[in-house]
Amino acid sequence: MSASVESDQPFRQSGWRTVRLSAANAEGGAPTEVQISPALGCNLLSFVVNGTDYIVAGDLEQEPRVLGSPILYPTPNRVHDGQMSFDGRPFAFQPNMGPHFIHGLVRDQLWQLDPPCTDGDRACLTARIAFAPGDPIYDLFPIANTLQVTYTVTPGAVRMDWLVRNDDATQRLPFGLAIHPYFPIIGPR
């Protein structure tokens, strides 16, 4: 069994660049593969097992935000009227669904990557995004913090491990974290 990593791979007809992780099938069948886009919020765009993609590729021209498995952070759900407070401190977000703000700030941001790894039958990739003073994303949510995800692919599976780190010693970090996978209907309804 073996695993592999290919960087700078095109995603279908979109031209988006991805990192492809794959793990060989022990029985000699098709490998398990994922494609992840660091520039699209570290979105898991594809998860293929035995030739079947379990993630919706989406309509790249009509609805490019309805694809893959976007990461939603630090506010994964609705923020009513784009306003919230935590520990008496107000936060304001630009509404993006009527008067409300949804799905956080990282889903279309560029993430930084560690060198990918392979070990026997697994391939992994660790990526992170930092909210640091001077970065535009920090201006939208001004508490220094880092979100990290590690994708690990083994035959038949993909695993995501998370780390949220508060880098600001003076205040607590309010956050929520979610993924929003778009799964296809496979087989009859």
Regions found by a protein language model. Name each.
Residues 1-189:
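Surface-exposed acidic/polar loop and edge beta-strand patches at domain peripheries
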